[in-house]
Amino acid sequence: MANHVPASFLTRANALFRKNLTYQKRNIWSNVRLIVIPFYLCVLLVGIQVLFDTQVNNSADNRCGCRCIHKNGDGKCERKSCGLQYSSLTQASFCAFPNPPPLLPLLQIPRPETRLVDPARSSCRRTGSCPVTILVTGNNHTLGETLSRNLLSTSFAVNSSDHFLRNLAYNVLGTISEADYTNYLDPGIHSDLPIFQIRPYCTPTTNLSFSFRQPPITFHKEVRCVQGLNLWRNNSVEVNDEIFKGYRQGNHEEIINEVAAAYDLLDTDRNKFNVTIWYNSSYKGNFKVQDRRVKYVRVPRSVNMVSNAYLRFLRGPGTKMLFDFVKEMPKQESMLRVDIASVIGPIFLTWVIVLLFPVILNSLVYEKQQHLRIIMKMHGLGDGPYWMITYAYFLAISTLYIICLMIFGSAIGLKFFRFNDYSIQFIFYFLCINLQISIAFLVSSAFSKVETASVAAYLYVFGSGLLGGFLFQFMLEGLSFPRGWIFVMELYPGFSLYRGLYEFSQYALKRQLNGSDGMKWKYFSDSAMDEVFYIIIIEWFLALIAAYYMDRVSSSAKDPFLFLKNLIKKSPSPQRHSLQRLGSSVSVEMEKLDVVEERAKVEQLMLESSTSHAIVCDKLKKVYPGRDGNPPKMAVGGLSIAVPPGECFGMLGPNGAGKTSFINMMTGLVKPTSGTALVESLDICQDMDKVYTSMGVCPQHDLLWETLTGREHLLFYGRLKNLKGSDLNQAIEESLKSVNLSREGVADKPAGKYSGGMKRRLSVAISLIGSPKVVYMDEPSTGLDPASRRSLWTAIKGAKKHTAIILTTHSMEEAEFLCDRLGIFVDGRLQCVGNPKELKARYGGSYVLTMTTSSEHEKDVEMLIQDVSPNAKKIYHIAGTQKFEIPKDEVRIAELFQAVEKAKGNFRVFAWGLADTTLEDVFIKVARTAQASNVFS
């Protein structure tokens, strides 16, 4: 039993969810292949890693240098000796160091132009005289000030160059030279830059030069004095804030304010020494592709300084902890190792994640191209349930996709995944796929063909990765590129995704190279991830809102900027709008009386706002704009008809007459150029979404899901009509029987295996399920055999008791059997309207006599007809067969039979027949007359 209460939001959402669940179950292997794509891509990364390692191992520059020390008789080397003495500078770092040389314990100090200074004293940067700043904090301010004064030595002595390293233990020396990758020579010594002596104050005598030997090289160095400035801060938060703001990206002015060291003395007192030391880990390297080894970082001198300060506090100024040198740990011979996943991770994973975008976009555009979206909407599925269920499906698939990516990547040992916090990664990927889905919904409104959408989507995929890797990353790492423009570039979704992946790769490299923690929540605000998160979240919501708006606009064929126009001028009400059209319309063509009467009836119904008719069309017009220099094409010209419940109104017309355009306007596929129509008192120009809840449609072409069965189609559309439980099952069984799809398990076969006729019958069953109040059928019996066609007609006739049906057809037999009234449509205009008998009586006031004789008796036949009816017309003649149209008012049937029997005595008549005017004759006559009048007009 039909439930005429419109289905609720949840009911429609449930219908779509269950349909999609069944559909995806039938396409399970396609979904599995999509989800396991990350596995193959991760394996590809491993393959690239193996290939890279093979190439690296074959290169002499990536291992310690060797020399052949013994050759055999054939000249082939039998024994090699490897070591520093045989290596180039490139090869040296890969050599074994069983006994590393001692290294000078220098303090890393900032360059003069980057040292932390008060803005009022920044002129020292130009002269190179800025002091070196050391920050100190702790729980005990007095103790902190005391230890600060003890950090730096007030004397400097170099007794002998032969004991230079030992003498260094009594002084604090530093260098502005960044440490290099070498672990046997300190760049602070073998570079041309001077060594700096850090003192509380400087005098001219504190600058000197000396020579010392570090076999096999003798160095000549200049020692310059630089003032050390110890500053107290209230707590570690202030220290952290000052250090962070000292980085170029930590302040809006992009000014570097660097400190040499910082100490938190915590709860240190005379009985306990507890200190935290800050140092600049960025000196370890910039982690670019070409710089994978760890740089030397001068932390030991910072430790020695605070230790000596505490000893002086306890034992007096003469106490010192001697610091002769530092040495690297002995190392074995090594080779270059690069983690490819971390190096190419950003560009590669950008492609991997964005690869879902074409899948989502193609799916959305396919439903629009095949009109599956609109046919669901025509049967009552609103935009809200469609969006909720479709979005949830894409989100579920995308979430499984990224989970598999993280699992597979971690399982095969990719450090990109293993070295970063999984929760941060998941949330980042989750936000990215939500933004990606929202953008796919937004962009889908701009495409009508899958091929075009697919090309654009893959351009976006590859463009995002390539531009990110070769443009965005270059600007990101460039110190001179404004940070504000980086933010602007990140507004492009592909670059915000790339930036997040870039941060993950950098933190993974840092952990690999210097043992840091990787990306953790505690470092979240120190990276650019918080900025990326904010951008993605805001764009996600904005894209979602814009996509929903554009979807509503495109589905209703409205101007995207209609909301702006509505703010300026309020739209008139539907009823007043139709009255205005009535008053302003002028017709210059002569119309038949029946058409004029139908128009007058429509005007009266519109004025009275009557609800007695389910469908009322008022001067409905559709004009398609001209293209390629052609004039505009009028498909429907001011059609006015009214159809009450229980009536089947048939539309006859030649191809191109405008029948399908009329159906498309009534079902919301196209927007009327002018005029309107009321369906159950709802205006199709204003309330189409409400109209859909009481409407059924059988389109000209079958819009079905190939993998769903006939029963599953009816289950889906029945639920949209608010049928439930036993009522739903009963309605489905009755529908299947009425269209002859219930036998031999046909109902449970996929629609893709149906013949054309079976698909047509299923489309009719879909349009009638749930007893809709209005049904549109566009050539419903096309492609059916006679038996199936007759069965289908019976089903349609039985369904029209409380339903208004508008039907288009080329079958006169179908029109006579089903239609209570007919309208003949030619060149976009209604030429006549009435029931089949009235039309035949009105346009068919003649008999058609057909007679076949030999060719020599054709004249005799003509004379016979002229004797019977002087006004008879010959309408057909070929090879002895002639047809004549005889006016009914000039002859009686009995007289005609007598005349033929008499003629048989004079010449041989092979065959003859007399027929009344058929509906086809009426149609041809009206169509020819209308087309002829259009030609002459």
Swiss-Prot record:
Location of the protein in the cell: Membrane
Positions of transmembrane segments? 34-54, 340-360, 394-414, 423-443, 455-475, 478-498, 528-548
Originating organism? Arabidopsis thaliana
Q: What Gene Ontology terms describe what this protein does at the molecular function level?
A: ABC-type transporter activity; ATP binding; ATP hydrolysis activity
Where, by residue number, does ATP bind?
Answer: G653, P654, N655, G656, A657, G658, K659, T660
Pfam family of the protein (one): ABCA12_C
Task: State the similarity comment.
Answer: Belongs to the ABC transporter superfamily. ABCA family. CPR flippase (TC 3.A.1.211) subfamily.
Residue ranges the record marks as coiled coil:
none
- Keyword Nucleotide-binding assigned to the entry: answer is yes
PROSITE patterns membership: ABC_TRANSPORTER_1, ABC_TRANSPORTER_2
Question: Which gene is this protein's source?
Answer: ABCA4
* Protein name per Swiss-Prot or TrEMBL: ABC transporter A family member 4
* Sequence ranges assigned to domain ABC transporter in this UniProt record: 618-852
Membrane topology per the entry is: Multi-pass membrane protein
Q: Name one GO cellular component term.
A: membrane
Q: Which UniProt keywords apply?
A: ATP-binding, Membrane, Nucleotide-binding, Transmembrane, Transmembrane helix, Transport
